[in-house]
Amino acid sequence: MSVNDWAFLVLIGVILALLLIPTGEFMFRVYTGKKTFLSPLFVPVEAWILKACGAGSDEEMDWKSFAVAMMIFSVIGIVFVFILQEVQQFLPLNPLGATAVPWDLSLNTAVSFATNTNWQFYVPETTVSYLTQMIGLTVQNFMSAAVGMVVLVAFIYGFSRRSSHTIGNFWVLLLRSIWILLPLSFVIALVLVSQGAPQTLSGPVTVPLLNATNDSGGNIITTQLISLGPAASQIAVKMLGTNGGGFFNANSAHPFENPTWFTDLVEIVAILLIPVSLCFMFGKMIGSVKKGIAILIAMMILFVPLLGLGIWSEIGGNPAFTPLGISQAPSHLQSGGNMEGKEVRFGPVQSAAFSVITTVTSCGAVNSMHDSFMPLGGLVQIFDIQLGEIVFGGVGSGLYCMLVFVIIAMFIAGLMVGRTPELYGKKIEPYEMKLSTIHILIPIFLILIGTAIAVSITAGTSMTANPGPHGFSEILYAFSSVSQNNGSAFAGLSSDTFYNLTTAFCMFVGRYAIAIITLALAGAFVAKKIVPPGEGTLQDHRPLFIIWVVFTILIIGALSFLPALSLGPVVEFLIQMGRGVIHV
């Protein structure tokens, strides 16, 4: 690794450390109704919207009403995006004349963006119009992220309130989430535009090629069509809301989505900003910042080794080139390492770092092709996702999924010392433990059963670009990604009706079943009294607590997915080590 690579990684950490507290404090003040510098603008608008909708800011909901409101809102979003894709040929802002999207692909896309997954089985430049991108997909980038944040705040109320039966008002919290996302997205979009990302309603432009070329039919090609569009506004919230769906097919590897090293830095910071700041906000809301920081430290302990392994796997290069005498060492002429599927403006270190960050969160954006990573690099990406998107995770969803693991860890710890388990002053009883267990098992079942079905039928195996262990990895990655609402992919997997429908089902269940169970947990905890810690209570901010949570997460992750990983990336790695080249 060069000095520039180290400086890039350190700069990410420094910027996040500087922004963590002010961003967390801002979110805390927004959700608790305290005054912020944006209150003069947003408070009157919020009051007007709530009045127009017949909702009051002081009207609270129990967890069931909250869940119903969430599902109604989300299903309306799915239906709207589905219909929009089917009628886009009749609507304006369609310079390339995009036609109606096939119904199964349209359903997959609608569910994908509403669930914050942003799995893309289509080419955005040619499949959807500017209007569909703007009022359909970009709007859902805001709304799906806001829903995740809303569920988290309701879950936090479960711990911070006592002897109650309400967990907030869905509509009020939804609006306040938008007040957080909107100004931050605006700033990020301006930065992207300043660096060269397009934000225009003009159609594509035709430019002459520097060197003429021939197409597959032997015809001489002298010009190229370059797609444009209102990209910067969608890219900003795609990153900030950990959505990940690209305006262009190459996603953040495209020079219009991610033009420079500086935009790469901005996009990485945008991905991590809200997830890490939510830990601080969580601590503030339950009355102890150090408890939120303890959760953040646990996430960091899991993250740093994964980041290191991901980078190490790529800077070493591809052993298949060694017998050919091809140098993969870094020099003033090349970045070195495994450069297949990577942009030269980023190199292997920035590409690997981006891939780890986008898979530990639920973002799913890519600045390189994950399918071209070394087996260990691919293993890290898949394992990141399979951990449950809890290492930072998606905005809102990452922290509430992490807290479910904390519940299980504290339950086990309580049983080991022979006392009633408790967390943040709330007792953990069989009902909460059953819900937490189901919460963790649902994505595990979706991933493993979905993969098993796909590898057992022709409709599943015929869509992989590679046979053997890498083909299995492509399928395993796909079902891991959609079930955990990540959205990235090993791009060697193509779409058909089977994958469009099965992945849509996994996305829907993986998002909303988990969210509903989280709300049920919030409803159970909010009704409990807060009990003072006693002798033998595991302090929920001490190093022992952090280590125990990390240990619990790793045990559950290893036991759940090690057999499946052994059939894919682990086998690839062993073949690579044994022969120096991968044969598939």
Curated annotation (Swiss-Prot):
It is found in: Cell membrane. Pfam families: KdpA. Signal peptide: none annotated. Disulfide bonds: none annotated. InterPro entries: KdpA (IPR004623). Keywords: Cell membrane, Ion transport, Membrane, Potassium, Potassium transport, Transmembrane, Transmembrane helix, Transport. GO terms for cellular component: plasma membrane. It is a multi-pass membrane protein. The chain crosses the membrane at residues 8-28, 65-85, 139-159, 172-192, 262-282, 292-312, 398-418, 440-460, 507-527, 544-564. The keyword Ion transport applies. Coiled coil: none annotated. One of its GO terms (molecular function) is potassium ion binding. Part of the high-affinity ATP-driven potassium transport (or Kdp) system, which catalyzes the hydrolysis of ATP coupled with the electrogenic transport of potassium into the cytoplasm. This subunit binds the extracellular potassium ions and delivers the ions to the membrane domain of KdpB through an intramembrane tunnel. The system is composed of three essential subunits: KdpA, KdpB and KdpC. This is Potassium-transporting ATPase potassium-binding subunit. It comes from Methanoregula boonei (strain DSM 21154 / JCM 14090 / 6A8).
